[in-house]
Amino acid sequence: MPGIRGPSEYSQEPPRHPSLKVNAKEPFNAEPPRSALVSSYVTPVDLFYKRNHGPIPIVDHLQSYSVTLTGLIQNPRKLFIKDIRSLPKYNVTATLQCAGNRRTAMSKVRNVRGVGWDVSAIGNAVWGGAKLADVLELVGIPKLTASTNLGARHVEFVSVDRCKEENGGPYKASITLSQATNPEADVLLAYEMNGETLNRDHGFPLRVVVPGVIGARSVKWLDSINVIAEESQGFFMQKDYKMFPPSVNWDNINWSSRRPQMDFPVQSAICSVEDVQMVKPGKVSIKGYAVSGGGRGIERVDISLDGGKNWVEASRTQEPGKQYISEHSSSDKWAWVLFEATIDVSQTTEVIAKAVDSAANVQPENVESVWNLRGVLNTSWHRVLLRLGHSNL
């Protein structure tokens, strides 16, 4: 398309932070050290996980770049970046999380397919841009619309990004029209991240941000928006990112038997120490993140030192020095909380964290109960082992 192109090879990739752990080089998939996630409430752009399916698109001429709005609408049109920037701008603090976050731990139970991720395929950012609900009004679709006279019920986002899973075609995903037109769903066409222009890795010049939903639906390098009758038939909606039971394998899988995953479940992870960490005897600070999808707040984070028999509640913050309350009026409803608890360690100790969201959803105890062949949505209790010895902690 004019102004932007998806290259077929990897010779013009952007620079990346040297501390990122590279899980796949081509396409580039990497995550920061887990300790970086609890260093600040808002994750620095350079340390935000990178999830890609092909070479990073290149913008040749920003003024020529446009997004096509088409499909079941009366008046299809093109919007240039200046048109989108002329709409009211909103800043939304929202956590994005790859559905494969914590896949590596799931693969230790049984083999799974997918990029190996530790606990850092997640990040929290302030996204700036226009609300999708405002953009759709420009083509005659009012706010809070679930369906139209032309039969539209879904909104599909198509990327410039070309990927092998689509046989060289574009990456695409969709959400319901009711979510797209709901101003309180805060779906953005974002051109800023943490107050700066999006960089190439994160979707420059324009991306979708769908808060509370797995990252696969927040399409980067936006090419077109299609208003359609059925959900997107793209590979990543129909043959990936679905939650199957442990009994399903690659011989008996039926992709059409499951709906595409949208909201992510309640999740938490300990980030101040590694899965196995040497510590000195005495007090140890346990820090991590907790988040739930769908705009559900975190009701509490529990810490156990005895295998889950007894629990203590960790403190939770979004803003330093302010008590967190999981209500929309007093919290960033799409964003994680950071938690902290100080424990006394006198012997080898397994530390467990689990979160409970505002709908009383709780993380499952064992990874075995949520194992699936694609290794997605590992939200089991997070466990780390502290051993006594020499340590910098």
From Swiss-Prot:
Main subcellular localisation: other
Keyword Metal-binding included in the entry's annotation: yes
GO BP terms, alphabetized: chlorophyll metabolic process; response to sulfur dioxide; sulfur compound metabolic process
E.C. designation(s): 1.8.3.1
Entry binding sites for Mo-molybdopterin: Y49, K50, R51, N52, H53, C98, S159, V160, D161, H202, R207, S218, V219, K220
One Gene Ontology cellular component annotation held by this UniProt entry: mitochondrion
Keyword GTP-binding part of the UniProt annotation: no
Gene3D superfamilies per the UniProt record, alphabetical: 2.60.40.650, Oxidoreductase, molybdopterin-binding domain (3.90.420.10)
Region (Moco domain): 10-242
Region (Homodimerization): 243-393
Pathway annotation from the record: Energy metabolism; sulfur metabolism
Keyword field: Metal-binding, Molybdenum, Oxidoreductase, Peroxisome
Cofactor note: Binds 1 Mo-molybdopterin (Mo-MPT) cofactor per subunit.
Residue span of motif Microbody targeting signal: 391-393
InterPro entries assigned: Ig_E-set (IPR014756), MoCF_OxRdtse_dimer (IPR005066), Mopterin_OxRdtase_euk (IPR008335), OxRdtase_Mopterin-bd_dom (IPR000572), OxRdtase_Mopterin-bd_sf (IPR036374)
Subcellular location: Peroxisome
Function: Probably involved in sulfite oxidative detoxification.
SUBUNIT field: Predominantly monomer; also homodimer.
Protein name as catalogued: Sulfite oxidase
Lineage per the UniProt record: Eukaryota, Viridiplantae, Streptophyta, Embryophyta, Tracheophyta
